[in-house]
Amino acid sequence: MQMITISLCMIVKNEERILARCLDSVKDLVDEIIIVDTGSADATRRIAQTYTDRVYDFTWIDDFSAARNFAFSKATCEYIYSADADEVLSEENRARFQALKETLLPEIEIVQMKYGNQLHNGTVYNFDEEYRPKLFKRLRNFIWEEPIHEMIRLEPVVYDSDIVITHMPEQNHAGRDIANFRKQIAAGRQLSRRLYGMYARELFLGGADRDFLKAENYFQAQVASPDRSGDEITEGCCVAAKAARLRGDAVSFFKYTSKVIAGDGCSEICCELGH
């Protein structure tokens, strides 16, 4: 079996303290390194250039997907490994990565790796590892399936590997992400169901009191929307209830907590009632 080739793609900004640590742990496992700088004011770009001549500038437009798509567009290898500067591969997991590179079946289109070290960094996650898609086949071949009434397979072939990426963040990014959510809403963009849930989650993970108050009107409107599912209404009620408590508005507080308690309930509402 021929060993696959891998492009490392990263987007970075002001990562001079940790970029070398990440690159040193993966540089000999990949066949090309592509680094996209989104506006660093420190030595990040200079450090990146000591590892690769494939360093590109990208004007930041408050869109992580746009930046990652730009990085991916520069890749030339069979697979793309997407990494962040605050990630590290241990020696054990470097060996697993190399073994994967040598044995990966050609039909695999996405490889998931475990994201570890969550609890060590003082987050409010109740788990230490979770699978995340990290390695992607650059060019996808469409395959017909079924002997009768044949159809194209749309879902990618995903492999859950035993590789664990150690996450070593220098800071909590919740504040940055919450500000980006507000910008999207202020610009009149409709949040997808996934982003709506992530906005609520980010608030409870690392939002300040002022962030809940700024988000209150948005989530109140979403709770009243007929387009939201039961789970989405619960998420919105959690944010609205906390904001109401912070304002000392007992009527609104019990309006939103009652909506959740009347259903299945949730830990966030129980916590708010405890306050």
Regions of interest found by a model, annotated:
Residues 9-32:
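Short, well-formed alpha-helical segments that are part of the catalytic scaffolds
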Residues 17-20, 42-51, 92:
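Acidic helix N-cap motif at the loop->helix transition within catalytic regions
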Residues 31, 45-70, 74:
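Conserved donor nucleotide-binding strand/loop of the catalytic core
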Residues 66-72, 78-83, 89-219:
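Catalytic-site signature of metal-activated, phosphate-bearing donor transferases
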Residues 25, 37-47, 60, 84:
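A conserved acidic beta->alpha catalytic loop
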Residues 185-192, 222-234:
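Flexible helix-coil transition and linker loops at the boundaries of alpha-helical arrays
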